[in-house]
Amino acid sequence: MTLIVTGAAGFIGANLVKALNERGETRIIAVDNLTRADKFKNLVDCEIDDYLDKTEFVERFARGDFGKVRAVFHEGACSDTMETDGRYMMDNNFRYSRAVLDACLAQGAQFLYASSAAIYGGSSRFVEEREVEAPLNVYGYSKFLFDQVIRRVMPGAKSQIAGFRYFNVYGPRESHKGRMASVAFHNFNQFRAEGKVKLFGEYSGYGPGEQTRDFVSVEDVAKVNLYFFDHPEKSGIFNLGTGRAQPFNDIAATVVNTLRALEGQPALTLAEQVEQGLVEYVPFPDALRGKYQCFTQADQTKLRAAGYDAPFLTVQEGVDRYVRWLFGQL
């Protein structure tokens, strides 16, 4: 049976295509918008059965052009949290997602989709409950609104619906994202270009570089998606993060030490990196005040209750692996 991945040339989508290939799955329809043409590079080492532009996909899927579809991994979205065009965001992230969902329900296909931790906004609790959901931007709202649709539809659905609230994802195949790429990606490039990594200074009660996030490797994101793909009886909305909040300082220190190790130099403590000017703190930008999550940490209770019991990579493990991969691409 056919599998469909939307956003297939994007960051998480391409990693899912690759992970499916590694399991022997090649009957995959890749759906994306290649207006940004350089994204094609993410699929060069992947095997797919067909490619469709997102503008023609939904109509063809809805009328059954692809025969029996087992599952749709819906990763396609505008993920730019600084996007201010609300009409574009809602059309792209909300209405388009509803159309894909409707087609899946009509055909009995598994629907596994990308939600986001941006739904929680400035909340200090990160559980999959309506009362703690308060997005700070229109991106978060587009994801929030779709999750509300899912909550209404899920009780009557005859096929799987699984949504994943991705926390701060990093890893291979994200270079096309530009400013929206992960902190690890930007730290890597900045250190190579300038010989130092810059982090935000003090803000909202957090010391320099001590704003904390739940940083999750795209390797783990793919594994969780595939777990639910293998268990179509399990539906729900699930946080997808490590369950650990780690400061940006941990990312920077790991990037610096991994690059030093690749050059045969010894590891340094964060304090030593700061003292030597390898990590530098800059004033927090006014444009982000009031719109910035200083703390995120996935509550994994629902995910673990659904049977996913594999450990998640720490920042030190995952970022080290990622930096070595980036270095190997040079």
From Swiss-Prot:
Look up the record and name the cofactor or cofactors this protein needs.
Answer: NADP(+)
Q: Which Gene3D superfamilies match?
A: NAD(P)-binding Rossmann-like Domain, UDP-galactose 4-epimerase, domain 1
Signal peptide boundaries:
none
Pathway in which the depicted protein is active:
Nucleotide-sugar biosynthesis; ADP-L-glycero-beta-D-manno-heptose biosynthesis; ADP-L-glycero-beta-D-manno-heptose from D-glycero-beta-D-manno-heptose 7-phosphate: step 4/4
Q: One GO molecular-function annotation for this sequence?
A: NADP binding
What domain of life does the native source organism fall in?
Bacteria
Q: Which GO terms describe its biological process?
A: ADP-L-glycero-beta-D-manno-heptose biosynthetic process; carbohydrate metabolic process
Keyword tags: Carbohydrate metabolism, Isomerase, NADP
**Does the UniProt entry include the keyword Isomerase?**
yes
Q: Which Pfam families match?
A: Epimerase
The record describes how the cofactor is bound as: Binds 1 NADP(+) per subunit.
- Active site annotated at which positions? Y139, K177
Q: What does this protein do?
A: Catalyzes the interconversion between ADP-D-glycero-beta-D-manno-heptose and ADP-L-glycero-beta-D-manno-heptose via an epimerization at carbon 6 of the heptose.
Q: What is known of its domains?
A: Contains a large N-terminal NADP-binding domain, and a smaller C-terminal substrate-binding domain.
Q: How does it assemble?
A: Homopentamer.
* PANTHER family to which the protein is assigned, alphabetical: ADP-L-GLYCERO-D-MANNO-HEPTOSE-6-EPIMERASE, NUCLEOSIDE-DIPHOSPHATE-SUGAR EPIMERASE
Name the protein family. Answer: Belongs to the NAD(P)-dependent epimerase/dehydratase family. HldD subfamily.
- Listed name of the protein: ADP-L-glycero-D-manno-heptose-6-epimerase
Q: Which organism is it from?
A: Burkholderia thailandensis (strain ATCC 700388 / DSM 13276 / CCUG 48851 / CIP 106301 / E264)
